[in-house]
Amino acid sequence: MSINPLASKIASPYARALYDFSVEQNIMHQVTADFQNLDVFLAEVPTLMEYLGNPIVTATQKEALLTKTLKSQLNAETFKFLMVLVKRDRINLLPTIITTYLELVYKTASVKMIEVSTAFPFTTLQKLNLIKKLKELTNAREIRLVVTVDSSLIGGFLIKTNSKVIDFTIKNQLENLAKHLDGVLEI
């Protein structure tokens, strides 16, 4: 979920314009659902973004592919927006635009996006308990977890939200213990 600052700066006006338009046209729920589904789809099929981001592929070819694969799956306005991105040669920013747009929606709806890195996948019960605790800590009505599994953490989990990082990993505890022992043994 880390975003290139330059890409974010370029993508932000597009996300804001789509957000404003979707609110104005009363289609925010449809566009949001489209973007949530697209986000999952792009994560599952990374070759699509490689193709769309390829400068050798013409805008016409990109439009044809999107028409074939996504037109029937998306709200008409969402699809038109994708075509605008292709025409303006900004389709490569789609993942960043999606993230920025969803952040705007979640901020409005008091939904917090929280990144969690864990050594092992969470069970459903663990996820629900973590969401419950995070709701209490953040006063958000809803929490959206973005979970990544990172076996280098050894055990535990790491929570990132906005500028806060809460580290409950065994790797961090071992590093802290090593620092403490280094300090004690330097007599």
From Swiss-Prot:
Subcellular location(s) per record: Plastid, Chloroplast thylakoid membrane
Transport recorded as keyword: yes
Membrane topology: Peripheral membrane protein
Keywords for this protein: ATP synthesis, CF(1), Chloroplast, Hydrogen ion transport, Ion transport, Membrane, Plastid, Thylakoid, Transport
Protein name per the record: ATP synthase subunit delta, chloroplastic
Lineage of the organism: Eukaryota, Sar, Stramenopiles, Ochrophyta, Bacillariophyta
GO MF, any single term: proton-transporting ATP synthase activity, rotational mechanism
Summary of subunit composition and partner proteins: F-type ATPases have 2 components, F(1) - the catalytic core - and F(0) - the membrane proton channel. F(1) has five subunits: alpha(3), beta(3), gamma(1), delta(1), epsilon(1). CF(0) has four main subunits: a(1), b(1), b'(1) and c(10-14). The alpha and beta chains form an alternating ring which encloses part of the gamma chain. F(1) is attached to F(0) by a central stalk formed by the gamma and epsilon chains, while a peripheral stalk is formed by the delta, b and b' chains.
UniProt family annotation: Belongs to the ATPase delta chain family.
Signal peptide limits: none
One GO term of the biological process aspect: proton motive force-driven ATP synthesis
Annotated GO CC locations: chloroplast thylakoid membrane; proton-transporting ATP synthase complex
Highest taxon in the source lineage: Eukaryota
Function: F(1)F(0) ATP synthase produces ATP from ADP in the presence of a proton or sodium gradient. F-type ATPases consist of two structural domains, F(1) containing the extramembraneous catalytic core and F(0) containing the membrane proton channel, linked together by a central stalk and a peripheral stalk. During catalysis, ATP synthesis in the catalytic domain of F(1) is coupled via a rotary mechanism of the central stalk subunits to proton translocation.
Entry keyword Transport: yes
Organism: Thalassiosira pseudonana
